[in-house]
Amino acid sequence: MAIAFHTFLLQLLLFFFASFAEANDSRKTYLVQMKVGGHRYGSSSGHQELLGEVLDDDSTLADAFIYSYKESFTGFSASLTPRERQKLMRRREVLEVSRSRNLKLQTTRSWDFMNLTLKAERNPENESDLVVAVIDSGIWPYSELFGSDSPPPPGWENKCENITCNNKIVGARSYYPKKEKYKWVEEKSVIDVTGHGTHVASIVAGRKVEKAGYFGLAEGTMRGGVPNAKIAVYKTCWRVIRKNGREDSVCREDNILKAIDDAIADKVDIISYSQGFQFTPLQKDKVSWAFLRALKNGILTSAAAGNYANNGKFYYTVANGAPWVMTVAASLKDRIFETKLELEGEDKPIIVYDTINTFETQDSFYPLLNEKAPPESTRKRELIAERNGYSILSNYDEKDKGKDVFFEFAQINLLDEAIKEREKGAIVLGGKSYDFNESIKLQFPIASIFLDEQKKGKLWDYYKKDQSKERLAKIHKTEEIPREEGWVPTVAHLSSRGPNCDSFLANILKPDIAAPGLDIIAGWPENVKLSSDRPANDYRHLRFNIMSGTSMACPHATGLALYLKSFKRWSPSAIKSALMTTSSEMTDDDNEFAYGSGHLNATKVRDPGLVYETHYQDYIDYLCKLGYNTEKLRSHVGSDKIDCSKTEIDHDADLNYPTMTARVPLPLDTPFKKVFHRTVTNVNDGEFTYLREINYRGDKDFDEIIVDPPQLKFSELGETKTFTVTVTGISKRNWNKNRAFMTRNTWLTWTEKDGSRQVRSPIVIYSIKGPKACM
């Protein structure tokens, strides 16, 4: 009897422990969006009161409550069980309860390439009063790039966690997933353990450092776009180990919102945001709404467009596409890394551009050993891993040491053991499983080169030409060389493209602008190995590193915007307009959905002539005209004064934007007419006359474009003029076809009468080819 009772008691205890564990495991982080007005739960204490009313019996506020937001979001974040979430969703005060998403991070001649050289005129006193908010993976504060002699801006309150603020880093706070269960790879501090945040911050505002470089490559002076500006760090991305054992970066949406909350309260001058999520509808994109609140407070946001284009194949992938955000695509620089594989007896080497080899292989040629598959041999070999018919071998005979080894492979991480075994050798790589392009640079801790399928074939032809003798090869150290004469900026294949699938944003051209994002050398934490993800056996450390992506393009745009702000105390939209309308033309004429207005160019950015001003209320009116829900809009922006019910719905509503874009309906052979209304502001003293010019590319893409009036006359600074652009045509089958949409495009340029100023705006009319185009 006693045994049975003890068994029952044990089972009962196990049941309660299991129930408790299950309840904890079922908790997930949610964002609770509140309605505005009409209830008592609007404050932080009100949020906690509401949450306390719906908690399960065995839960406490300490278990559930995470953040209350003031500036960026109307509501709070909490760790909820499914039942608690359901209770909250039924409350009349609550608008929406949604999962906090995990967003993704998007990676010294680049400033010279944009014509912002060391000799460029600067305003150091004003520049040193500017603060950039870098919302990223933290910072390595001990880098020489992050020193400064000038004090923080007047009235600025230094807020630094775990580190001591200095005259360059004037803020450093961290926001980590408080309720999510992860195995942490790093300590909960602002110190950067991935290198991403350090790299980004140094591109924007790193101070001048002589003799910077990367193992002898691209040596020169490293500096940010605004080397005198201050940096406020808001760490939202962390390295963790997930349940499947994989190490990954976690950038939770609730933490990002809290970082934006604090950045707005701190009154920073600009936000640099190199994170994002492949296309998110505006109604669900809470981070974008937080950036609208930042704009209301005079803060421009520069954000990465995303790295989701898959070698230029995927459109409809642009991230951070709200019109109040400056969305930045990644471009190639005017110099390129070239690596040669020299084959003995051959006149021409094999040349690749997707490898960085930092090792000298002296002057000697080395035997080329084919290890595509286990050869029939008595030598002992161990098969490390095999995937889809590709293999990697180790435990080679000593006599094989120092030979070039040719591997076909399916996954880079399979190379780790091979690299460890042959740390003095060289590896030649090739395979069908990787579709590499100029956007990704492979590098390993031994002499190495990557060959794509075509160039691998050339090596095979050489290898098999005469098998009676040993084949010899030599990998040269990578060199940085200028591109061919006449080269103009090109969009990187990884950079995400428009158009925007969201019906509320269909008539906004995104990205806005392109900036250097490929092979960018910038600051790096000395405690972080150069290849933070792969291979596992790379333990090299440097003060600088090479990274690629829209993450690197974004801080270039941030830096140029701050540079302009150091001279002009303009509104966020005026600064954005100046960057867009003074940009340089790019190649791929019909691909504005890849690069927007063009490529950043500092030459004329301080004197754009005219700017397109778009104020906070303009965005509200625009969304109301498109039929946005009043209650949701009030909650998104945190104001009960908005009332869209009195606004007449107009699905052709226009925004005073520096670009002119419209989606016109199919079917084909249907006439269309689109009218754009624009207002420009004169930003110069004196009298000026601007003449309109339509820049057709080849055959005229439209039946007719009428600009009324054809000239604009200004007599004073700040004067505004309004004009209309009427575009008519027929949606024909011979339009340029780009994946799932068809487009026609041209440019409107307002040219000052003496030719000294040009204000360029692209005109893009497009149709999507079917309902699945945006899926």
From Swiss-Prot:
Keyword Membrane recorded: no
InterPro entries with a match to the protein in the record: Peptidase_S8/S53_dom, Peptidase_S8/S53_dom_sf, Peptidase_S8_His-AS, Peptidase_S8_Ser-AS, Peptidase_S8_subtilisin-rel, S8pro/Inhibitor_I9, S8pro/Inhibitor_I9_sf, SBT
Pfam families registered for this protein in UniProt: fn3_6, Inhibitor_I9, Peptidase_S8
GO process annotations (BP): proteolysis
Signal peptide: 1-23
SUPFAM superfamilies in alphabetical order: Subtilisin-like
All copies of domain PA, residue ranges: 365-459
Residue span(s) of domain Inhibitor I9: 29-105
Catalytic residues in the record: D136 (charge relay system), H196 (charge relay system), S551 (charge relay system)
E.C. no: 3.4.21.-
GO cellular component: extracellular region
Record PTM: The C-terminal propeptide is autocleaved.
Any GO molecular function: serine-type endopeptidase activity
Keywords, comma-separated and alphabetical: Autocatalytic cleavage, Glycoprotein, Hydrolase, Protease, Secreted, Serine protease, Signal, Zymogen
Protein name: Subtilisin-like protease SBT4.1
Organism from which the protein derives: Arabidopsis thaliana
Gene: SBT4.1
